[in-house]
Every structure is written in C-alpha cells, then in structure tokens.
Amino acid sequence: MSNRRDTIFALSSGRPPAAIAVVRVSGPAARDALTALAGRVPQPRQATLLRLKIPYSDGGGPHLNSAVEPIDDALVLWFPGPRSETGEDTAEFQLHGGYAVVAAVLSALGTVEGLRPAGPGEFTRRAFENGKLDLTRVEGLADLIGAETEAQRRQAFHQLNGLLGDRAERWRRRLTEALAFVEASIDFPDEDVVSEQVIQPALAMAKELEQEISDLLADSHRGERLREGLTIAVAGPVNVGKSSIVNRLTKRSAAIVSPHAGTTRDIIEVHLDLGGFPVTILDTAGIRETDDPVEEEGVGRARARAEASDLVLWVTDATLKDSLPPPAHLTKAGGPPVWVLSNKSDLAQGKNPQTASDGHTVRCGSMARYRISALTGASFEDLVGGLAEYARQFFSEGGESALVTRQRHRSALADCAEALRQACAEEASGREDIIAEELRLASRALGRLIGRVDVENVLDVIFRDFCIGK
C-alpha cells in the first residue's frame, strides 16, 4: 500500500478551452477538498451537481466561503478508498472547460491544507502501488494513451486488460506449486517414495512452462514492432521519382521533388496510418557512385536503412529499357522483401516500358512488381492496398494479439525460461536444492515482469512518460 500521506490534484482532461474539464484529487485529504470547495461530500459514486466556491480556513479546517462569487456549477463525484481508481480516497470535479474556470478550481485546491499538484503519472503510480494495476497494465495504459492507429489501440487495450499480466500470474501460481513439490522432497530427505513422487511432477510442470514461454518469445518481436511501426524504405537510383512516390503515399509534400539528380541527401521519415497499422516511410538518397562526400554519406545511410527495414520499395524508371536492378545486398537471403515499383508509367507509352503492357501488378508471395505513376496516381490505389495487406499479415502472424510488447517483458520472460531450463537440467543429478533455487529465480523473473519485485529502477522511467493528471 502507498505510504504517502499527502494528497495530489491535477487537471486530468485535455488542455482548456474545452467543453468539459475534469479535475481529480487523490489522497487522505480528498474529503477535505470536497468540503472546502463544494460544501459537502456527496454520496459515494453518485454524480452530484454542486456549486463550487473559493474556500477559506479559520484554523479549524477549510470551509466554504459564501461571501464570494461562486467558481462554477460542477458535477462532483466521491470515491472512498480502497474502492477507487487509485485505491485511495478520490474526488472528481467535472467543470466547464474554460481557462479561467480551471485555473480558479486549481488555485482553490492549492489553498487546502495537505494538497499539492500531482507529478507526471502520479495517479497511475499510486494505483500501481496500491495493487490496482500491475506493471504490464500500467504499460498498456501508457501505450493506449499514445496509440495512433487502430492496431496499436487494440494491442494496448488488451495489455491494459491483463492479457500478459494475468497469464504471468497463472504461471507464477504453477511455479509456486512446483516449488512446493520440490521443497516437500527437501523436507523429507529419507522418503525415497515421496521424493520420486514430487520431483517428477515438478519438473514436468517446469518443462511445460518453459516450452510455453519459449513459444511465446518466438514471435518475431511482433508486439514491439507494432508499438514502433512497420518500416518501409523507398530506395533506388537517382531521378526515378522516389520522393514523388513518398509524397503520393503520404498525401502531402513531405519530400523535396526536383529534376536534378541527388536532391535527397539525408533520410526523410514520414509516419502514417496504413489500414489501421503504424507505418514509417523512409525516403532515401538515390543510389549511385559520386565524388560528393555529402551525397556519398547519404547513399551509405540509404543502403544501411534499406537493409534494416521491413520492406523495400525499389523504384525504377519505366521509360528506360535497362534500369538498375535491386542490388545484391538487398536481395540476399535473410534480407527484407523487395518490391519493384516501375514508376513514370504515364511517360512510358509508346516507348520500351520495363513491364508488360498487359498488367500493372504482378505479385508472387512476398514479392511484387507494380507499374505506377507518381505524377498521375495510376495504380497507387492498388499499391496502397498491397502495402496495407502486407502490414496486416506482418502484424497478425500467429493470429492472437501479441503478449510481449516491450523489451522489458522479453528480458524477464527470457530469464524465467532460462531458469526453468537450468532446473530441468538438474533432473539427472537429483539436486533438489539447486532445482528449488532455479524455480525461485524463475518465479522472481515473473515477479519483475508484473512489478512484484525488483522494479524500483524502472518505475521512474515508465511513469515519466505519462502526462500530469494521469
């Protein structure tokens, strides 16, 4: 439980002006705040319309000041702890969302003894410390607030509702049961029958759990990638229209377009929502041999980012009979899929186009070739549809929502799986004490995952990303 004795308050809704503003108060003096501003404490969990006024104190506690103009008529709610979002006494004021109204209420709360402004994420941190949320749910809440696409929202919502945390709790209970078996064997060292009966079930549970976690970790980092977004690099020779393609995909002038070769020197990143999935489009420098050291650096960066991307769109000029094919470093085994975009199809009429005239798109597995025009938009609808489908398949591999969404989750689960493997490796030796210790380490790793143990060093990092009032 939280050992704080102070009470915090903050604006929890968006920055005014707005139709409605919500001010929250949490802590032992929340009742005093209600009495000071609203004159009374409403029935628990019932929205009550009350007139807020500026409080005063005569040394015997805060009181409603009837001699001054009221601040606002507000819906007031009272949530006695521990049946509240933070686990503490909590009050909520739903106000009209003007600057002056919000400022007056915050100023009035600041005069109530024992109240102070909240820091970033402090309401959520108190909920965590009071057992209302485990750490995976806290991270899910942070991701939900920061979600920019529908897929990110779904993943964050599942995490907030315990998709990983609940499973980790079930795993911990199974580990506790296995550990109890092993410790029973240690407590009765002379009972061979007892030892044989309990060690085997314990190790069988450990093996099963290790396999479950290992299967979970073999997910191609889908959860982390969904938080970060799919990376698509637009690459190719100079003057083939890469920047025009980026601008057409993003529906804005994100990149400079020029008839002069080598205009793009550095990598331009553009973020967009593609079919509900987060995507980062990279406009890279045209690849060619050059004596210009600045352009040469840009070409080097382009090669490196293309190799590290999830998909490469290699752009060629449809008006040329012989165009530069994708280089070997992009088509090697283990590299990203490479789609070929034959651009300037509007100018290729009557010339020797690269692609056959009887089809604009050829797709085979993860490979594709599109005949497009960045100028007219020809076949771009087909290209965008293909990219959206690729993103859907990329993030939906395995069917169910990803459980592991952060590197912290992955590290804790990897530590747990390794401890379980070490425990199982001691089966032949019969060293119950070592088996028990490895099972304890596995349980401790799961405890770190959900925030039960060894998390003080990560709490500040997690909560600093929250806004004030959350």
Tell where the protein language model's regions lie, with residue ranges.
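Short, acidic/hydrophobic/Gly-rich beta-strand patch recurrent on exposed beta strands
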Residues: 24, 246, 283
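A glycine-rich (often HGG/GG-containing) alpha/beta subdomain
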Residues: 1-154, 158, 162, 334, ...
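Conserved beta-strand segments of alpha/beta enzyme cores
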Residues: 116, 278-280, 368
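Inter-motif core of Ras-like GTPase G domains
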Residues: 295-319
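C-terminal-of-GTPase-core extension/linker across diverse P-loop GTPases
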Residues: 2-15, 55-58, 150-273, 290-292, ...
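Conserved G/P- and acidic residue-centered "switch" motifs that form tight phosphate/ATP-binding loops
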Residues: 131, 239, 283
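Switch I (G2) and immediately adjacent beta-strands of P-loop GTPase domains
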Residues: 51-59, 63-80, 262-290, 308-311, ...
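Alpha-helical scaffold elements adjacent to nucleotide-binding pockets in ATP/GTP-utilizing enzyme cores
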Residues: 108, 140, 305-308, 386
